[in-house]
Amino acid sequence: MAAKDIRFGEDARTRMVRGVNVLANAVKATLGPKGRNVVLEKSFGAPTITKDGVSVAKEIELADKFENMGAQMVKEVASKTNDNAGDGTTTATVLAQALIREGAKAVAAGMNPMDLKRGIDQAVKAAVVELKNISKPTTDDKAIAQVGTISANSDESIGNIIAEAMKKVGKEGVITVEEGSGLENELDVVEGMQFDRGYLSPYFINNQQSQSADLDDPFILLHDKKISNVRDLLPVLEGVAKAGKPLLIVAEEVEGEALATLVVNTIRGIVKVVAVKAPGFGDRRKAMLEDMAVLTGGTVISEEVGLALEKATIKDLGRAKKVQVSKENTTIIDGAGDSAAIESRVGQIKTQIEDTSSDYDREKLQERVAKLAGGVAVIKVGASTEIEMKEKKARVEDALHATRAAVEEGVVPGGGVALVRALVAVGDLKGANEDQTHGIQIALRAMEAPLREIVANAGEEPSVILNKVKEGTGNYGYNAANGEFGDMVEFGILDPTKVTRSALQNAASIAGLMITTEAMVADAPKKDEPALPAGGGMGGMGGMDF
């Protein structure tokens, strides 16, 4: 086992705080409307330019192992806040730095670290309650657009396109972000349920212009096995032909004689049919077929529940207003399912989302909720260069997370004002002893740090602006973008409550751990091995002729 280098007490904390400061100073330069860019070197290709706090934090590794431990712990604050709320990483880092720096000074002055931690926790708990009190629900599109704009570094076009996307697919709908091919941002909305499977034969195409198969008011057959024998399909085909309606078949596979018969019937105009493969694999395929059954009011024809295809009737089929099938996608629009059954199914999937620990499963389950609840919107990010595209896409994703958080827990006045209002409300707190009270004071001073940093990045004097904001009440604050004081809500400067709350709680959590650290252990640096002596020539070789 390698030898270890161990540091204790003040020496350990000093090095750790040094690492915290290096990382936090790089990250906090990006805070606020006048925050600066940070350039990140890449191992290949052009460097990345970003104003995204978590992107900066992730790139930082320090040479000194003890300093690096401090930096990595603050990096954890940024990452955790990003995971919880999707934004607020820079605010969390600024709060953590302020808490750790003041806490380390207090410990050096001889105060009890555990009491300091208890005091900080007490203040944060009270501040979170106050944040919830001043929070307002987000209901209108304007507020959603404002939250998105602030999170995207005051880019109104991003805030507006996110608000439009949410309006079209609902607050539960899936909104994805992709790299576009143009210069402007574009919004592409897919209504109804879409899955990534297209027609099994080009002979099903009936719309030559769009090269798709369009079915109006069709019946929908859902089957979880292969269909290769046309005799199994005859009862359903006869029923559909009598009703004079088209038919969409979604099955594991339609092949051989069955597929050939369907193609011939379609070409001759006897019955309009389109066959597609079921989406997904294994259990996910079964679940998605069930979703389709609920959406269309049909039944999945499955031997597992005692239903055989040859016994299926027209009553087992689902219905929809319209179905569009292209080469790669199938879209079911306005299914005839019972709305109560759809809501129940959505609730069931949401429970699974809460229970799952896999990010991949969570993403797929959320997609299923969206497909049942309203549709999918795709924001295509436009930019003139690849570097700008990457930076802009990261900002759009941040803004999207922030707006979701705002819908979930409401909004508070932005620009660091909410934390200033919370600290004024909990300023009378007292701890069980002097050290705990000092811990409370540390937390209250730290809650001023985001506003101070926003003002400093705007080139103004933080203390002067902070005192003026403290003199005001409610939403009164400082707009760093134009240097005006006024109502932050009217200025459109809003932060999601969840983002501010998560930033404060995560910063306090890591700061508490770091203040109470008494020893640090790292691998000792390896000493360079002594070099081998230089080899000399062989003796006794003189005078030889070659």
UniProtKB/Swiss-Prot annotation:
A single MF term (Gene Ontology): ATP binding
Top-level division of the source organism's lineage: Bacteria
EC number: 5.6.1.7
Gene Ontology biological process terms from the UniProt entry: protein refolding
Binding of ATP, residues: 30-33, 51, 87-91, 415, 479-481, 495
Compartmental location: Cytoplasm
Keyword set includes Cytoplasm: yes
UniProt keyword list: ATP-binding, Chaperone, Cytoplasm, Isomerase, Nucleotide-binding
Function: Together with its co-chaperonin GroES, plays an essential role in assisting protein folding. The GroEL-GroES system forms a nano-cage that allows encapsulation of the non-native substrate proteins and provides a physical environment optimized to promote and accelerate protein folding.
NCBIfam families attached to this UniProt entry: GroEL (TIGR02348), PRK00013.1 (NF000592), PRK12849.1 (NF009487), PRK12850.1 (NF009488), PRK12851.1 (NF009489)
Subunit structure: Forms a cylinder of 14 subunits composed of two heptameric rings stacked back-to-back. Interacts with the co-chaperonin GroES.
Name assigned to this protein: Chaperonin GroEL
Native species: Xanthomonas axonopodis pv. citri (strain 306)
Organismal lineage: Bacteria, Pseudomonadati, Pseudomonadota, Gammaproteobacteria, Lysobacterales
Gene it is expressed from: groEL
